[in-house]
C-alpha cells in the first residue's frame, strides 16, 4: 500500500522515509520475474488531495520497470473501519467535491469520494481529534504534511 507521495506518505507511514521506500522498490523490481507493478492506496482525509501525485508516481513506477505495457490503474480502497476519524465521510462535501476535480482521478477513486459525499457525516472534531492523536504519538504536525485545503478546514479557516 502506497498511500501518498513524498511528505504525505511520510506522514501516513511514520516513521518511514520516502527515499527508503523508493530504494526498497528499486531493489524489489530489480529481481527477476517481476513484470507488472500494482499499487494500492487506502483513500482517506489525509491523502484525498494527493491523487494526482499518486497517479504520476504509479505511471513513473510502471514505466521505470516495465516499458512494454501501459500502467495498471491504481487500486483504491476505503479506510477501515469506515467510521474512522480520517474516513472521507467526515470531510465536508465541498472538500470532497474539490477532490473530484483532480485530473488523475480514477473511476474507483471517484466512486469512493462520491460515497463520501452521498453518505456524508461531516465531523470536524472527529477528524481533528484523530489527526491530533497521531501527531501527539508521533511528534509530528499535520500542518507540515497535509494539503492546505485540509489544514485550512481543520483550523476553521474556510475560504
Segments (PLM) and residue ranges:
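Radical SAM/AdoMet-radical enzyme domain recognition
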Residues: 1-90, 95
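Radical SAM enzyme core and accessory elements
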Residues: 102-159
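Active-site rim elements
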Residues: 9-14, 38-42, 99-100, 113-117, ...
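Extended, charge-rich low-complexity interaction segments
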Residues: 70-80, 99-113
